[in-house]
Amino acid sequence: QDMQEMEAQGKRFGVEENPLREAGNAVDYSFPVERKEFLFVTSPFGMRQDTKDGTKRMHTGMDIRCNNGDAVLATEQGGKVVAVGNKSLTVEYPRADGCKIQCTYKNLGEVFVRTDDTVQAGNRLGKSGKSGEHLHFSVRQIHADGTQRDVDPAAYLAEIAQKGNIKQQVLHNGNDLFAKYKSPENAKENLSPDAWMKKLLSSEDSGVGLSGCS
């Protein structure tokens, strides 16, 4: 969802306008995939060109590189599993302002939870599968009036990172996807192509193909 459009309608999403809790720590929040240094995003939120027919389509989530069998994790405390499919699941988290945040995980190999289960941050929800060797992670904000918005997962994860003091970066082609959601003094410089390749080759995902995913 375009942040400017949301602000024009008086609906905001972010660490200042949509607080998770008064105080948080790493126990209260988690990224959807455990990584020691950074999440490797192969396809971010936004318009992208279809590799098959060349048409441009909106990609409403982000694709996170995974090894087959990597655990996928709940991101917050007190989530409720509201949907489970063969290779997907959705967890819903309430907000103090009456809105709800839904996090959806797709391309799973196994699902460990059932509908109506309550989950806490860091709980294992399932395992990534063989479909493109990536986790498709999307975020939807449901306002108290019932209107719904697809939110850039980078904005949501930036919020999670700040509230939970999570230090891992979220990178796409060497670019810090959190940069536009940080204050200038906290923004990190993007990596040069050589530095990005060096970082990839030394990362946990170095044994996985580096091409983008559909």
Model-derived features: positions:
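Surface-exposed, glycine-biased beta-strand/turn segments
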Residues: D2-E92, Q120-A121, D176-S202, G207-G212
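Solvent-exposed, flexible loop/coil residues
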Residues: Q49, C66-N68, F112, A155, ...
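Amphipathic alpha-helical interaction segments
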Residues: D53, V113, G164-N165, E204
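Zn2+-dependent peptidoglycan hydrolase active-site motif and core
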Residues: R57-T60, N68, A74-T115, G132-Q141
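Conserved, short, structured surface segments that act as functional micro-motifs
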Residues: D63, T90-E92, D117-K182, N190-L191
